[in-house]
Amino acid sequence: MTNIIDQINAEQMQGKEIPDFNPGDTVLVQVKVIEGNRERLQAFEGVVIAKRNRGLNSAFTVRKISHNVGVERVFQTYSPIVDSITVKRRGDVRRAKLYYLRNLAGRAARIKEKLSGKKGD
């Protein structure tokens, strides 16, 4: 039974192209929004503060500041609502979950940019 479930999960994950990103990275997520009878793409750009790797049930949390209010949104990685994910900037952090950023504002909430040391990175 579990083999069948794993096989279905693998099929669902196969068609989606997900870039490699980590907490601390700034990403641009294109989300499909349906308004009435038309569909459009809405951009949500922010810092990844958490990532949950669970196969088909994988998710990540993106935080941005909009009009001086912190906005967090949790995206299911393989959801059909998520059209594309683009990594804008790599962040250099030492934590897997960056929940401490919720309590910081302005310059204190900045994340150092990761300098690529290797050619492939």
Swiss-Prot record:
GO term, biological process aspect, one: translation
InterPro entries, alphabetized: Ribosomal_bL19, Ribosomal_bL19_CS, Ribosomal_bL19_sf, Translation_prot_SH3-like_sf
Recorded GO MF terms: structural constituent of ribosome
Listed Pfam families: Ribosomal_L19 (PF01245)
Entry annotated with the keyword DNA damage: no
Entry superkingdom: Bacteria
Disulfide bond residue pairs: none
GO cellular component: cytosolic large ribosomal subunit
Annotated keywords: Ribonucleoprotein, Ribosomal protein
Function: This protein is located at the 30S-50S ribosomal subunit interface and may play a role in the structure and function of the aminoacyl-tRNA binding site.
Family, similarity comment: Belongs to the bacterial ribosomal protein bL19 family.
NCBIfam families to which the protein is assigned, alphabetical: rplS_bact
Protein name: Large ribosomal subunit protein bL19
Species lineage: Bacteria, Pseudomonadati, Pseudomonadota, Gammaproteobacteria, Legionellales
